[in-house]
């Protein structure tokens, strides 16, 4: 196995211009946002000497007279309707604890999920005893945020057939602030793989199924070997997502696909080299700018 090691002095510094939005007002803790007293103080700010000062590093967002700072690197703050990817950490009475990259563990109630086969009925004691047969510790799931409690904890549900247990694939963890909010977060890419872009920063990359298992009730038990071609596509997509996240570019289906196409001249293992990563991301950014016109 070939290994490549570089000394810190030999590494090329990444371009600071990449991943930065010129239109956004970036601040660090202690920066003065405004001296106008007509604005309301929001999250990530505080008043000091009649000035509105940032308390976290991030971008300034204004809604009418409300000013807040959205942190660039933070834990996931759940919102109703968000699509998330999570990992089961504990099986409890009539519920599962799920790790979703938030400050507190999320909760998936037994009554908030589809039974295998999509059967609709009241949950019985037999269902409660068979909970570990449905989902056990370590299983990955896709779900939707049903409610957010006062302490910030999130309640999930998987009642739709497109949610449920995930099969074979690769999990990539990025900052939640890099995942662009869209109408749908389930994408079948033309390269032969699919992605689930969780609003919580967990991205699931998996081979596109030949037929949709709508009758499985959200439970995927496909354990057939994945072909070498599919594994190479998934590995390339994974490295492209890591490259975009390293350069602080927003992640959505178009940016990931453009980055994948830009990486095709290079070997999969070389994509994460700093100079190649910068070249690929610059080409991706240029194509996105041309598309926007």
UniProtKB/Swiss-Prot annotation:
Disulfide bonds: none
Record's keyword annotation contains Cell cycle: no
GO cellular component term of the entry, any: nucleolus
CDD domains associated with the record: KH-I_Rrp4_eukar, S1_Rrp4
Transmembrane segments: none
Domain (S1 motif): residue spans on this chain: 79-159
Subcellular location: Cytoplasm; Nucleus, Nucleolus; Nucleus
One Pfam family matching this protein: KH_6
Keywords for the protein's UniProt record, in alphabetical order: Cytoplasm, Exosome, Nucleus, Phosphoprotein, RNA-binding, rRNA processing
One BP term from GO: poly(A)-dependent snoRNA 3'-end processing
GO MF terms, alphabetically ordered: RNA binding
Phosphoserine found at: 124
Main subcellular location of this protein, as a coarse class: cytoplasm
InterPro entries: Exosome_cplx_N_dom, Exosome_RNA_bind1/RRP40/RRP4, KH_dom_type_1, KH_dom_type_1_sf, NA-bd_OB-fold, RRP4_S1
Recorded superkingdom: Eukaryota
PANTHER family per UniProt: EXOSOME COMPLEX COMPONENT RRP4, PNAS-3 RELATED
Recorded family membership: Belongs to the RRP4 family.
Function: Non-catalytic component of the RNA exosome complex which has 3'->5' exoribonuclease activity and participates in a multitude of cellular RNA processing and degradation events. In the nucleus, the RNA exosome complex is involved in proper maturation of stable RNA species such as rRNA, snRNA and snoRNA, in the elimination of RNA processing by-products and non-coding 'pervasive' transcripts, such as antisense RNA species and promoter-upstream transcripts (PROMPTs), and of mRNAs with processing defects, thereby limiting or excluding their export to the cytoplasm.
Assembly and oligomerization: Component of the RNA exosome core complex (Exo-9), composed of EXOSC1, EXOSC2, EXOSC3, EXOSC4, EXOSC5, EXOSC6, EXOSC7, EXOSC8 and EXOSC9; within the complex interacts with EXOSC4 and EXOSC7. The catalytically inactive RNA exosome core complex (Exo-9) associates with the catalytic subunit EXOSC10/RRP6. Exo-9 may associate with DIS3 to form the nucleolar exosome complex, or DIS3L to form the cytoplasmic exosome complex. Exo-9 is formed by a hexameric base ring consisting of the heterodimers EXOSC4-EXOSC9, EXOSC5-EXOSC8 and EXOSC6-EXOSC7, and a cap ring consisting of EXOSC1, EXOSC2 and EXOSC3.
Protein name: Exosome complex component RRP4
């Amino acid at each position: 196995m070939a290994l490549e090691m570089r000394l810190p002095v030999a590494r090329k510094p990444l371009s600071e211009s990449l991943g930065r939005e010129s239109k956004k007002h970036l601040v660090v803790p202690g920066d003065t946002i405004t001296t106008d007293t007509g604005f309301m103080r929001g999250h990530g700010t505080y008043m000091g000497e009649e000035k509105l000062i940032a308390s976290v590093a991030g971008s300034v967002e204004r809604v009418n007279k409300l000013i807040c700072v959205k942190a660039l690197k933070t834990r996931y703050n759940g919102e109703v309707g968000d699509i998330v990817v999570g990992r089961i950490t504990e099986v409890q009475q009539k519920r599962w604890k799920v790790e979703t990259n938030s400050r507190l563990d999320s909760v998936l109630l037994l009554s908030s999920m589809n039974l295998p086969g999509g059967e609709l009925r009241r949950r019985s004691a037999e269902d409660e005893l068979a909970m570990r047969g449905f989902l056990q510790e370590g299983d990955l799931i896709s779900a939707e945020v049903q409610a957010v409690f006062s302490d910030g904890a999130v309640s999930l549900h998987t009642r739709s057939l497109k949610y449920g247990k995930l099969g074979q694939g690769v999990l990539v963890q990025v900052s939640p602030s890099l995942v662009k909010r869209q109408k749908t977060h389930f994408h079948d890419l033309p390269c032969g793989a699919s992605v689930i872009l969780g609003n919580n920063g967990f991205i699931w990359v998996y081979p596109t199924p030949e037929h949709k298992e709508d009758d499985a009730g959200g439970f995927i038990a496909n354990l057939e070997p994945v072909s070498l071609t599919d594994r190479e596509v998934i590995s390339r997509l994974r490295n492209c997502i890591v490259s975009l996240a390293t350069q602080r570019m927003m992640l959505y289906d178009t940016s990931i696909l453009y980055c994948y196409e830009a990486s095709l001249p290079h070997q999969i293992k070389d994509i994460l080299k700093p100079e190649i990563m910068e070249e690929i991301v610059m080409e991706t950014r240029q194509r996105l700018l041309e598309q926007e016109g």
